[in-house]
Swiss-Prot record:
This is Trichosurin. One of its GO terms (cellular component) is extracellular space. PANTHER family: LIPOCALIN, MAJOR URINARY PROTEIN 1-RELATED. Milk. The keyword Transmembrane does not apply. Gene3D superfamilies: 2.40.128.20. Pfam families: Lipocalin (PF00061). It comes from Trichosurus vulpecula.
Length: 180
């Protein structure tokens, strides 16, 4: 009797989740299409960090996204960054991991990159756990398809990170700043 109930429960769960009957290859293709939605042009709108110096002018994470492409599940980013008053190109690749929504990036130390949330035609949020010189810092990026996102989206981003312990002065709206 217990086995029958367990079997019925499992059948019900699988019935509610169509992935149970799909092959891993089908799931992989679906995930790839989802990530492809992130491809194309983006703008850096808001930056947040546990260490403000990382996102201040000429800081290592004060980078202006131009484009994202997805290849084999890896995220390739083309950024502009300002060094010594000059804008220089910066190409970064975040490599997919076994964990959903997590990537690895070698830049200014090593980084665990998490894809937070998005509406792919409007905005995307990425969170970096940066390991550099024995310190761990958190950096968050809000990217928009246009340079100016609604105040509602920016406010949700700010509230989310203030609830995680960020101080308001460590959240910078750079939508009006010269992006090179």
């Amino acid at each position: 009797m217990k086995l029958l109930l367990l079997s019925m429960g499992l059948a019900l769960v699988c019935g509610l989740q169509p992935e149970c009957s799909r092959s891993e290859e089908d799931l992989s293709d679906e995930k790839e299409r989802k990530w492809e939605q992130l491809s194309r042009h983006w703008h850096t709108v808001v930056l947040a960090s546990s260490d403000r110096s990382l996102i201040e002018e000429e800081g290592p994470f004060r980078n202006f996204i131009q484009n994202i492409t997805v290849e084999s599940g890896n995220l390739n980013g083309f950024f502009l960054t300002r060094k010594n008053g000059q804008c220089i190109p910066l190409y970064l690749t975040a490599f997919k991991t076994e964990e959903a929504r997590q990537f690895k990036l070698n830049y200014y130390g090593t980084n665990d990159v998490y894809y937070g949330s998005s509406k792919p035609n409007e905005y995307a949020k990425f969170i970096f756990y940066n390991y550099h010189d024995g310190k761990v810092n958190v950096v968050a990026n809000l990217f928009g398809r246009t340079p100016n996102l609604s105040n509602e989206i920016k406010k949700r981003f700010e509230e989310d990170f203030m609830n995680r312990g960020f101080r308001r002065e460590n959240i910078l709206d750079i939508s009006e700043v010269d992006h090179c």
